[in-house]
């Protein structure tokens, strides 16, 4: 369906769907790493926020400070989520026409 001025909605919808599929594929392949406590807790996440690795320095476990360990795990996961969100914004912004990347 074409509108005055040559605007083709079907072509735009198809392009948007292709963009969405490309973005989903890139997010699936993306990996981000985050840490907390100076590297005591390390997390690796996929672009869809799935945690694929969580590593804890054994020395922190020996200290029996479970509350501190829990806080570091939460901090590492939150940092990973922040990095994924930043990467998504960056990738999406580079895929959109000039001027539209700032919408997100």
Name each model feature, range by range:
Residues 8, 65-72:
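Conserved acidic
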Residues 72, 76-84:
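Stable alpha-helical structural segments in soluble proteins, enriched in small hydrophobic residues
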Residues 1-33, 83-104:
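Long amphipathic alpha-helical segments used for membrane anchoring, targeting, substrate engagement
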């Amino acid at each position: 369906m074409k509108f005055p001025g040559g605007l083709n909605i079907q072509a735009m919808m198809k392009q948007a769907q292709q963009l969405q599929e490309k973005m989903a594929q890139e997010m699936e392949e993306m990996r981000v790493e985050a840490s907390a406590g100076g590297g005591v807790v390390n997390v690796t996440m996929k672009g869809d926020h799935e945690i694929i690795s969580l590593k804890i320095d054994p020395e922190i476990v020996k200290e029996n400070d479970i509350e501190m360990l829990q806080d570091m795990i939460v901090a590492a996961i939150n940092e990973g989520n922040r990095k994924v969100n930043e990467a998504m914004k960056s990738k999406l912004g580079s895929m959109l026409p000039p001027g539209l990347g700032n919408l997100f």
